[in-house]
């Protein structure tokens, strides 16, 4: 439960949110490209896009990290909550309760399985070693708990509460961003989409495994884990508010590369705060509020994402056309 169980629950929660309601589904325009044009219009184009993203991130990362003061917004989220407790308390209590229940379950299993091994190794240091083993157990149980809490998006309602509290007048329930997908019966799915996703997720799991191994280092490991995944933390927090701003799934993904420095900056502070057990249960809510405030103060408009729009316009536009078989 403390390891594989948390990962399984986190994965299920993420999939439910990713393919859940509140979205309109359209085929990726690439599915209409004839197979004899794939070399130029699919493979070379995607490779060129990856190289362009890499260059852009490397050239703008550090400048972007301090643009807009993204690292201050986890604190601004706390101040917003402190100023308007009555508006946020009910939703925040539900999130905190879910965190505490999950943290208790993970801690129980962790203490029954992994803590004895740490104790056996560190007991040679005497009382200090015992203290390190116990304290690290809480830190790492918090890591596994947050994997589930973040990917399950328990904080989504809080995003809507914060937007409404800050004067959003449109009916949020009517906003349905597009989710582009590749039909399983299309050439594009088998010739590019599935192999690419398979490699991507295998590499992702490998990186996650390495990061989790790092988190096993006593005391410093869990903190390093949160620092290293800081852009991913921000991606999760920004997903809901960007959906409500009508960003489709391609634009949300592109946004990570266009603002990689801001994602890392916000996630760095949010991750450090969430490294503290129990406090993390409150920080999930205040960081959520902070992510909304950042997007309100520095709005990101889908139409300005030139590369994303060019990517879609470069392909045939009749997305209702039957894909080549």
From Swiss-Prot:
Keyword Transmembrane helix: yes
Record keywords, A-Z: Lipid droplet, Membrane, Sporulation, Transmembrane, Transmembrane helix
Residue ranges annotated as Cytoplasmic topological domain: 1-91, 140-208, 285-325
Chief location: membrane
Domain of life: Eukaryota
GO biological process: ascospore wall assembly
Record's GO cellular component terms: ascospore wall; lipid droplet; prospore membrane
Gene disruption phenotype: A combined deletion of the LDS proteins RRT8, LDS1 and LDS2 fails to incorporate dityrosine and another yet uncharacterized component in the outer spore wall.
Keyword Transmembrane: yes
Topology feature Extracellular, residues: 113-118, 230-263
Cell location: Prospore membrane; Lipid droplet; Spore wall
Membrane topology: Multi-pass membrane protein
Residues passing through the membrane, by range: 92-112, 119-139, 209-229, 264-284
Job description of the protein: Involved in spore wall assembly.
Family: Belongs to the LDS family.
Name this polypeptide is given: Outer spore wall protein LDS1
